[in-house]
């Protein structure tokens, strides 16, 4: 499974219904599980973004489908990145051409 990091920003709608955010997060986790996606961590944050989700999915299509569904509800905007652990990154670097 591949690891992904999604940054979350509340929309105006999401802010107007901020008290429902924990309930929406629980529903999101349940939907992700049904889709075969494992939510590793979910955080609300201070700073440039309002939250972050770390999850594992079988491929980019599954990850994209999950975050598109989340964004389509209108409460958040998302930015998703593929994340690599130290072992994965070492393998990538070992295969890159040296200049």
What feature does the model see in each segment?
Residues 1-99:
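A compositional/biophysical signature of low hydrophobicity enriched in polar/charged and small residues
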């Amino acid at each position: 499974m591949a690891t992904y990091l999604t940054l979350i920003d509340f929309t105006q709608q999401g802010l107007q219904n901020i008290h429902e955010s924990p309930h929406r997060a629980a529903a999101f986790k349940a939907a992700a599980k049904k889709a075969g996606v494992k939510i590793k961590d979910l955080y609300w944050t201070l700073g440039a973004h309002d939250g972050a989700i770390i999850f594992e999915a079988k491929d980019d299509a599954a990850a994209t489908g999950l975050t598109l569904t989340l964004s389509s509800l209108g409460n958040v905007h998302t930015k998703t990145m593929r994340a690599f652990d130290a072992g994965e990154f070492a393998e990538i670097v070992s295969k890159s051409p040296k200049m």
